[in-house]
Amino acid sequence: MGEIDIKSAGKIYPNGTRALEDVSITINDGEFVVLVGPSGCGKTTLLRMVAGLEDITEGEIAIGDKTVNEVAPKDRDIAMVFQNYALYPHMSVYDNMAFSLKLRKLPKDEIEQKVKDAAKTLEISELLERKPKALSGGQRQRVAMGRAIVRSPQAFLMDEPLSNLDAKLRVQMRAELGQLHTQLQTTTLYVTHDQVEAMTMGDRVAVIRKGELQQIDTPREIYSNPKNIFVAGFIGSPSMNFVYAKIKTENDVIELTFGDNQIRYKDQKKEKLKSFENKEIILGIRPEAFEDGYFANEADYSESIKVKVSLLEQLGSDSYVHFYKDIKPVQTEAIEEILADEGEDITVLGDSTKFIARINPNSTVAEGEEIELKINPSKLHFFDPVSGDVI
């Protein structure tokens, strides 16, 4: 069994800095779980604790049926794939892949069979005699994977293995890693900063912020039902739009007012929203909750707002409309952290709130034009302005 069980894990460095606090995750046998979060959130630290490269300050980590807190890395029966490939430059591809097997003093014919099988799986059989310097980035990554595969470990630990590749190759390698996992069915714990990687590759995704686990669930559930404002803003590209909205109940219908805009809401969460009567909440609207009024299905997109297009991005398959509303932007620690991670500064907005809407690519809207955008109320999200938790 390759199950990884992390129970209340914590990490405090000798200088008193806390990197992780009370993290509990179970990666089931054969499951692919992705740790995702901003730089410095503790995801790599957690991976290194599982690998045995970092001491566990608090809690317990088990691999298979064995607690490994005091077990040396070499005895944990795991294989790690690093961001920089960590190949020996003076060795051939074959020798790089065979190195750990030779250390274990396996018979020569068994080593040869394992290396050839892994090379065939990764489609690098013709590269076995080459040195790493003669390989492309994608080929080096396959060799690094092959070196892990030949060990037949209980689990793979992968630390941002695709981050050094260019965008096109990253997409290709994402698909190949997914297919490889389907073939091998080896328990995998994967760390990435890229939420697109996390969503496309993971059976489940664990979102970490400031050393604490925010939510772990399937990609669909993480996206559709985020537990707090940080998860909602961090997952999704472009990010969710946030705006302060005032709640008012009228004839059993919730009215959400932001600036001079009103949205009527009568979906399943209305009872919870009633407790915020005449108070402000944080309203979350994903870009796809908008549509050009001309193309919108009235049954779904029942509400509308008038906007002036400040920027139009036409990507072929989608178009993105950027617009502003004269409303003070939502300023919470979580949102500022997300913007900082994206390289943006909330202070440049002043008293305006920026929105991005995804609309039908056949729309004829133009920059500077005033248009009607329809909104699907069933796709709205609501957050407590104090705690940041979902309402």
Regions found by a protein language model. Give the residues of each.
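Non-catalytic connector elements of ABC transporters
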Residues: 250-391
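Short coil-to-beta microelement around the adenine-binding A-loop and adjacent beta1/P-loop entry
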Residues: 16-18
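ABC ATPase nucleotide-binding domain
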Residues: 5, 26, 62, 372-374
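Helix-to-loop junction immediately C-terminal to a conserved catalytic motif
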Residues: 51
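ATP-binding/catalytic-site motifs of ATP-hydrolyzing domains
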Residues: 60-62, 66, 212
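The feature captures the beta-strand-to-loop junction immediately N-terminal to the Walker
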Residues: 36-38
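ABC ATPase nucleotide-binding domains
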Residues: 73-234
